[in-house]
Design a protein with these regions (language model features):
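Regulatory nucleotide-sensing modules
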Residues: 11-63
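Short, structured motif recognition centered on aromatic/hydrophobic residues
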Residues: 6, 15, 52, 106-107
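Short solvent-exposed loop/turn micro-motifs enriched in small/polar/acidic residues
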Residues: 26-27, 45-47, 67, 80, ...
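Non-catalytic, surface-exposed connector residues within folded enzymatic/regulatory domains
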Residues: 18-21, 71, 108
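Short, acidic, Ser/Thr-enriched surface-loop or helix-capping motifs
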Residues: 37, 55, 66, 77-78, ...
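A short beta-strand-loop-beta hairpin characteristic of the jelly-roll/cupin
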Residues: 60-72
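Cytoplasmic (intracellular) domains, linkers, and terminal tails of multi-pass ion channels
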Residues: 1-9, 18, 26, 116
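Cyclic-nucleotide recognition modules
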Residues: 9-12, 73-122
Length: 122
């Protein structure tokens, strides 16, 4: 996947509309494309938050354990959906587990870049 495709995809997402083109290009240069196989965990409930994720392709299931440790399905994320920002903003642990429901590619933005380019904007 080349930078132009990634830039075009990210530019279409509403929460990146606040960024100038140069800021968006710099943010993308700091982002990582990560591949996950079906069934693979992206992060677990209780993990420390270190990245914000955007679904580029595939499906990601969001799960939470109840008080009896049974998994509750909270939903499915698809292309263009994002997740993981709550733990970055609140500086708390992840409140859910995310697992690839099928082979998926995610764009991962680390905490430092997230705070600089997204969270600090009005």
């Amino acid at each position: 996947m080349d930078i132009k495709d990634t830039l075009r995809f990210i530019r279409e997402l509403w929460f990146f509309s606040i960024l100038r083109d140069d800021e968006l290009a710099e943010l993308i240069s700091k982002a990582e494309m990560r591949s996950y196989k079906a069934g693979e965990i992206i992060f677990n409930q209780g993990d420390k938050g270190d990245s914000f994720y955007i679904v580029y392709s595939g499906k990601i299931r969001v799960l939470r354990k109840d008080k009896n440790q049974a998994e509750i399905n909270l939903g499915v994320m698809t292309r263009g959906d994002h997740f993981g920002e709550t733990a970055l903003i609140s500086d708390k642990v992840r409140n859910a587990t995310t697992r690839a429901a099928e082979d998926s590619i995610l764009i991962a933005i680390g905490k430092e870049a997230f705070n600089k380019y997204i969270f600090s904007k009005p």
